[in-house]
């Protein structure tokens, strides 16, 4: 078995997907432009995806209140200090 995707219910799926594409280099594999605004974003391999969707009727996670060890997305970086600076400047 392989992991195909991880799904997150977020308050603004469209803008979050745009941010991940622009700043993390993820690629949009599939999306819907009407509610629940589902976006499947793939890494360079194209096999692991992050699904962002917006369902106000379902319980959403309080992301700022979640401690990083409980829920996080780990990324590889060739230049971690530079990427941290760049992503923080972009609003991460």
Regions picked out by a protein language model, each given a short descriptive name:
Residues 11-15, 68-92:
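Vicinal oxygen chelate
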Residues 37, 57-63:
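A short, acidic/glycine-rich surface segment
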Residues 45-49, 56-59, 80-81:
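Short, charged/polar surface micro-motifs in flexible loops or helix N-caps
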Residues 47-50, 70-72:
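Structural motif
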């Amino acid at each position: 078995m392989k992991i195909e995707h991880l799904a997150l219910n977020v308050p603004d799926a469209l803008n979050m997907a745009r941010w991940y594409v622009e700043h993390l280099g993820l690629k949009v594999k599939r999306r819907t432009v009407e509610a629940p605004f589902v976006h499947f974003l793939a890494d360079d391999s194209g096999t692991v995806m992050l699904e962002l969707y917006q369902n106000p009727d379902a319980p959403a996670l309080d992301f700022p209140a979640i401690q990083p060890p409980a829920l996080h997305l780990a990324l590889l970086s060739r230049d971690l200090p530079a990427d941290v600076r760049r992503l923080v400047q972009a609003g991460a």
